[in-house]
Amino acid sequence: MPKLKTRKAAAKRFKATGTGKFLRRRAFRNHLLDHKTPKQKRHLGTKAVVDRTDVERVTLMMPYA
């Protein structure tokens, strides 16, 4: 059986943790930041765990993660 290819778009967006979960970047921190509070912007800078409903899709895109 041939090797499975990693979807590079997903590899750039997600990072696997040691426990098998995936981390992702949060949305809404690219532009239009003037009206957001410093606390909001600081929180948006942290990583978030991919929801359990999406884990299977991410795993299929990154078979060796």
UniProtKB/Swiss-Prot annotation:
Any one GO BP annotation for this protein: translation
UniProt keywords, alphabetically: Ribonucleoprotein, Ribosomal protein
Protein name from the UniProt record: Large ribosomal subunit protein bL35
Family in the record: Belongs to the bacterial ribosomal protein bL35 family.
One Pfam family linked to the record: Ribosomal_L35p
Gene field: rpmI
Alphabetized GO MF terms: structural constituent of ribosome
GO cellular component: cytosolic large ribosomal subunit
InterPro entries referenced in this protein's UniProt entry, alphabetically: Ribosomal_bL35, Ribosomal_bL35-like, Ribosomal_bL35_CS, Ribosomal_bL35_sf
Domain of life: Bacteria
Transmembrane stretches, start-end: none
